[in-house]
Amino acid sequence: MHSVYQHWDPLKVCAVGRSFPPEFYSRIKNSKVRNAMERVAIETEEDYQKIISKLEEFNVEIVRTDISENVDDYCNDQGIVVAPPPMCPRDFTAMVGNKFYMPGGNYAKNFDVNEIVDKLLFKIAQKKFSNVSDPLVCKLAQKIEDILEPNHGLSPKSSLLKFQSRVTDKFKTFLYKDQEYPFWQVKHIVDFTELKELIIQAKCQTIYSNIKFPNNKHFYAFKSIEEWLNKNNVPIVYDEYINSATMTRVGKDLYFGNVNLIDGLNQDSLKVKWQKLFPNYRINTCNGIGGHVDGHFCPVVPGLILTLRDPKMFEETFPDWEVVSMPDEGWKKVEGFTKMKNKVRGKWWIAGEEDNDDLIDYIETWLHDWVSYVEETVFDVNMLVIDEKNVMCNGYNKVVFDTFDRYGITPHVINFRHRYFWDGGLHCNTSDISRFGDMKDFFPERD
């Protein structure tokens, strides 16, 4: 029987991601950009193989995500690659107990974001004071007021009261620039795109762009994983948006982070969902931690946490555990690169951008300067724990390695050179499917 209860139990079976091969970049006309991306592709697969080789030293069985050989499976009608490669299986999967949660055919289809927005608008139209207790309604009202009255400086709750004061009781119209408009026209005046993006991200428990590889209907990246699960009689739960990048498994306790603002606002309703999915667990929320929790902290073994955050954040959730903080590590050390990256994100795929000087400078700077800098100076808490005595990490940090030595832990350095180029560390690039061990209760006083 296959299961995962603690992510420091001995690893048996592990999924490993996969990126595009160098041939996928043959359409890029500018040789500087094409050659650079081909190099990134080659080195990325080399580093995946290093991960695999290290895991196989510990007799871990490997299952990889799948890549189509046809680049058109990742392109839109204009021939631009819009679907990213399945590099980070953990961002979309999780083994919780003996069930594996993963994307299926209804990924991002089993909810209607427009219907969600319509229901929120309907609640606003009712003008009930009780709406102030619905944080998502308040956030929607604030978004509307941002358009109707820029720079209003109102809080979400105050925005709700302000907008509801615009709405007439009898005819359900609202005042805008001294004119009355039918209430439904608010959908034509206000652009809800950004809000909808946040709602989708919160629903799918993902971060950044909603263009993720599970959305690719031309090719299913989890076919090999699905076949392995079926062959080994592992129950599969599709499209519940549970993953072990936003959730940490510590025996009977599950810890969930907030993906974004909307996720934080909906924390109570999400907690109800999690309690229904996991009735035999205690559900904990990591307040103050947004995005993927595995990029902020790692419970390495019982009693020890490594984090980029303030140790005080863990006093209630992990009482009496040692918390080793490294506030200046991780993304903070590559802020210069991330500014460049945000400026040219994804443009190497776009026809006409091949001669973009910013793009060329970005790629060349990454390959010539940042790759070696990251290898030598940046430590990442996005680590893969093989067992209680062996941890896979991206580099050296004296404080961390001294701590490991006190706990009898051997660090295995696997430098995933393009981790910050692809936004995926060693933990994200893998997903533990099976570990030895049964559920333990590290905080029995909570019952």
Where are each of the predicted segments found?
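The feature marks the mature, well-folded catalytic cores of soluble enzymes
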Residues: 1-447
